[in-house]
């Protein structure tokens, strides 16, 4: 029967999304009972989800591979096989305490600080995550909230902090959940009248990591339970690390008291990576895959794919897969040919009209005013921001950008770009506006 479980798991990996397999199925430990298998899960959340979503398929596969589909689920760790008694020795050896079995909290061990590519857009988030791992529960960064658009590395930093905490303290109980998982587990607990058990899960952990808390918006009971969970962990000096797709105060449907709690610790924006960081990410990901990527190809991808890390990885995966399939070397020409449709879609997603509309909406302006010849400060500054964003995020030339702004001269565009760059060094509000607009345009 034990030989059947790895084969069963391999089939499940092919049938279900990778994140689901990693979250719910990989933590399971199998014990052979002769005529059946017991699958041990690290907590009741996983037991409930496996029973509800995967158990029928697991039984089918085990029946196919082992001729018997009898499966039981339990919370805990697989019992260790008894060791033979040691032969007697003349000297008495002092007994040693058995090591504590590590807590399987759904952490992906692949994500570490070592393989996180640091850049200007994420260096504060990286420093904060390292501090949270080194000094868990410290009020200076508890809770630690990382916010920004999808695919910028928030979850990587969250996993890295959890893995570093576990490395420093192997017995630490670190639990990672997506917000949907917290919600689903709470609903199941309500249905089963098992809320006491649901709450006890969080009393036993050292750190709680929850992804995408914007999902809690509008779910009053979920927010209430998370509010009480948050208070208990915070009072117990247990580390809380959260991610959100925007600054929590901007999330409609989150209760004011929860927004207030989230502001107690440290909130850090993770912005889209700049060109140098994007190129470094492409080269680093290529090394991880054992692929040979020339620098000029990495620069091409970094120049064209501006939105997020996930898109960079997608472009790289496409390139490497086609190179392996065709046996061709990866060159700039090969990359342009392979990624042609992807790069075209990227350019269309962030065009000058989209930038103009986003900037006008952000500053509460009419489009006709943004493009007008009027030079009042309330119009001139947003107009310069829009021009600078067009230069930063598109491949259009200065004359083309000027034409899109009611036929302005290319020198006007150049002046706007230089002016905004200079002002952002001293004007924190303008820098904040710029970063928010970048995030909006990258969504």
Curated annotation (Swiss-Prot):
Question: One biological process GO term for this chain?
Answer: regulation of DNA replication
Q: Which GO terms describe its cellular component?
A: cytoplasm; plasma membrane
Report the family membership.
Belongs to the DnaA family.
Query: What is the protein named?
Result: Chromosomal replication initiator protein DnaA
Function recorded in the entry: Plays an essential role in the initiation and regulation of chromosomal replication. ATP-DnaA binds to the origin of replication (oriC) to initiate formation of the DNA replication initiation complex once per cell cycle. Binds the DnaA box (a 9 base pair repeat at the origin) and separates the double-stranded (ds)DNA. Forms a right-handed helical filament on oriC DNA; dsDNA binds to the exterior of the filament while single-stranded (ss)DNA is stabiized in the filament's interior.
Q: Which UniProt keywords apply?
A: ATP-binding, Cytoplasm, DNA replication, DNA-binding, Lipid-binding, Nucleotide-binding
Cross-referenced NCBIfam families, in alphabetical order?
DnaA
State how it assembles.
Answer: Oligomerizes as a right-handed, spiral filament on DNA at oriC.
Would the keyword Cell membrane be found if you checked this record's keyword annotation?
no
The compartments listed are:
Cytoplasm
Q: One MF term from GO for this chain?
A: DNA replication origin binding
Region Domain III, AAA+ region, annotated ranges: 106-323
Q: Which amino acid positions bind ATP, per UniProt?
A: 151, 153-155
Q: Which residue stretches belong to region Domain IV, binds dsDNA?
A: 324-443
Domain comment?
Domain I is involved in oligomerization and binding regulators, domain II is flexibile and of varying length in different bacteria, domain III forms the AAA+ region, while domain IV binds dsDNA.
Which stretches of sequence are listed as region Domain II?
A: 76-105
Species name for this entry?
Answer: Xanthomonas oryzae pv. oryzae (strain KACC10331 / KXO85)
Q: Where is this region: Domain I, interacts with DnaA modulators?
A: 1-76
> Main localisation, per the record?
cytoplasm
Q: Which domain of life is it from?
A: Bacteria
């Amino acid at each position: 029967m034990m030989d059947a479980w790895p084969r069963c798991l391999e089939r499940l990996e092919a049938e279900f999304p990778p994140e689901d397999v990693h979250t719910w199925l990989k933590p399971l430990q199998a014990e052979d009972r002769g005529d059946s298998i017991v699958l041990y899960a690290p907590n009741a959340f996983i037991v409930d989800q496996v029973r509800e979503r995967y158990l029928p398929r697991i039984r089918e596969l085990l029946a196919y591979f082992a001729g018997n589909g009898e499966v039981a689920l339990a919370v805990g760790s697989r019992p260790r096989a008894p060791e033979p008694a040691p032969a007697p020795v003349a000297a008495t050896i002092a007994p040693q305490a058995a090591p504590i079995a590590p807590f399987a909290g759904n952490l992906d061990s692949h994500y570490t600080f070592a393989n996180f590519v640091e850049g200007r857009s994420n260096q504060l988030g990286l420093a904060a995550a390292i501090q949270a791992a080194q000094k868990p529960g410290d009020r200076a960064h508890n809770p630690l909230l990382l916010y920004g658009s999808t695919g910028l590395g928030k979850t990587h930093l969250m996993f890295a902090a959890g893995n570093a905490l576990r490395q420093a303290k192997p017995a630490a109980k670190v639990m990672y959940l997506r917000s949907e998982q917290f919600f689903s587990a709470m609903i199941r607990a309500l249905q089963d009248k098992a809320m006491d058990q649901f709450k006890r899960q969080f009393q036993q952990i050292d750190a709680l990591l929850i992804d995408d808390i914007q999902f809690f918006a509008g779910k009053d009971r979920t927010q209430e339970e998370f509010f009480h969970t948050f208070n208990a962990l915070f009072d117990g000096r247990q580390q809380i690390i959260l991610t959100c797709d925007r600054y929590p105060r901007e999330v409609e449907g989150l209760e004011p008291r929860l927004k207030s709690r989230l502001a107690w610790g440290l909130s850090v924006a993770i912005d889209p990576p700049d060109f140098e960081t994007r190129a470094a990410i492409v080269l680093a990901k290529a090394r991880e895959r054992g692929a040979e990527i020339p620098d000029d190809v990495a620069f091409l991808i970094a120049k064209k794919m501006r939105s997020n890390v996930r898109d960079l990885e997608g472009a790289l995966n496409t390139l490497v897969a086609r190179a392996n399939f065709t046996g061709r070397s990866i060159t700039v020409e090969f990359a342009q040919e392979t990624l042609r449709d992807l790069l075209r879609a990227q350019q269309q997603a962030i065009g000058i009209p989209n930038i103009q509309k986003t900037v006008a909406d952000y500053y509460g302006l009419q489009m006709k005013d943004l493009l007008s010849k009027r030079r009042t400060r309330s119009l001139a500054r947003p107009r310069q921001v829009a021009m600078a964003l067009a230069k930063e995020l598109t491949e259009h030339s200065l004359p083309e950008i000027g034409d899109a702004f009611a036929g302005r001269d290319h020198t006007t565009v150049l002046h706007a770009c230089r002016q905004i760059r200079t002002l952002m060094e001293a004007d924190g509000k303008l820098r904040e506006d710029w970063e928010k607009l970048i995030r909006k345009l990258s969504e």
